[in-house]
Amino acid sequence: LVPSVLEGTKTKGVNGEFTLGENIGDLGGLGIAVVAYKKYLEDNGLEDVERQKFGDLNSEYTGFQRLFLAWARVWRSKARPEMAAQLLAIDPHAPNEFRCNVIAANIAEFYEAFEVEQGSTMWIDPEDRVTIW
């Protein structure tokens, strides 16, 4: 995987062995957030599709969609190519676009929330998805 800002350059992609520990942490963290939200719904006798109101705001998004959109917002960033290349070499975290997209694409509820279908750029075959715990 090569960050989009570095596509077409000679920069090597993400070193999966170098980022493995942080990738596991990200996947575990988002997975726990999904489990916690499901428990909240269950404990309160709710279904996700009923959760159209958020505080005083009406929302066009379901709770699961908001959960994944909040996850995505955390990883918004912009970097110059030089900085992106430097971070690839020294940072044990995957680039933010992968921390966002690849982690979410390994969570089954993401597919349900956004009706992601095979052929989408976000699709990972179920047997190839990674689960933690």
Question: Each PLM stretch: what is its role?
Answer:
Residues 1-133:
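Zinc-dependent metallohydrolase catalytic domains
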